[in-house]
């Protein structure tokens, strides 16, 4: 389950162990293989929207009760580890580069996990990306918000029914 590990050192150890045992190790983000994402990647590669300049996304769900694994600090709970990884992997996958600068701001719960996080990424060539992730809708509501907007020099792609589930 995401994240693969809490720090780079542990991720490297996992990859070393996988290599030593001749097995594959990967994070299983189903959405990356969905027809929706495949079509978006093709539009970008074909230059339909020109050069990508800005990506904005959001993934917000209902809150969870305090017993849920997503709400416990010792199990790497919080919205960034649970939800923000989708926007991060999506942005990096679409832009095919690492950010030069990342800034984030979060609101934390009594359990000291982030419940709402805002992240801004700046890339060396001037591209920018931002995302919001959160577990803020009322616990008794089965709600979620998935949003994606990609702005290019010749147009944009907007998804208001975007799903990080791979639908």
Regions found by a protein language model. Name each.
Residues 1-32:
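Beta-strand-loop-alpha-helix segment that lines the small-molecule cofactor/substrate pocket
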Residues 16-24, 38-53, 149-152:
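Basic phosphate/pyrophosphate-binding loop/patch that engages nucleotide-derived ligands
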Residues 7, 61-67, 138-141, 158-160:
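A short beta-to-alpha transition loop/helix N-cap that caps and shapes the active-site region
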Residues 1, 25-27, 56, 131, ...:
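Hydrophobic residues in well-ordered beta-strands that form the structural core
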Residues 4, 29-31, 58-63, 108, ...:
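Short, flexible active-site-adjacent loop segments at beta-strand->alpha-helix junctions, enriched
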Residues 31-110:
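Predominantly a Rossmann-like dinucleotide-binding segment in NAD(P)-dependent oxidoreductases
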Residues 89-166:
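Contiguous beta-strand/loop segments that form the cofactor/metal-binding neighborhood of enzyme cores
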